[in-house]
């Protein structure tokens, strides 16, 4: 599982992973954000993906207690206008899992927000 947050400009962020194998994921950890919370607006995916919100009982690392699938996308594309939030304060994470059957690239962009 890959997790990366890169501050682009001000409060904007992007998270990405290249060559994500089938059934592997991009895990977005809001703890890496300057304000400890993020809101994803756009998801670009090179194939089919599931987008999940995860909760963790451990505030230092992901110990998956529950996962809710927020959306599933078939084929490559860009999902725009999302408001998917995750926060270090509430121990929530975003996981984007490749379900396409082959390796794909995944990119998520959005803003860092106050908790």
UniProtKB/Swiss-Prot annotation:
Domain of life per record: Viruses
Protein name per Swiss-Prot or TrEMBL: Gp30
Organism: Haloferax tailed virus 1
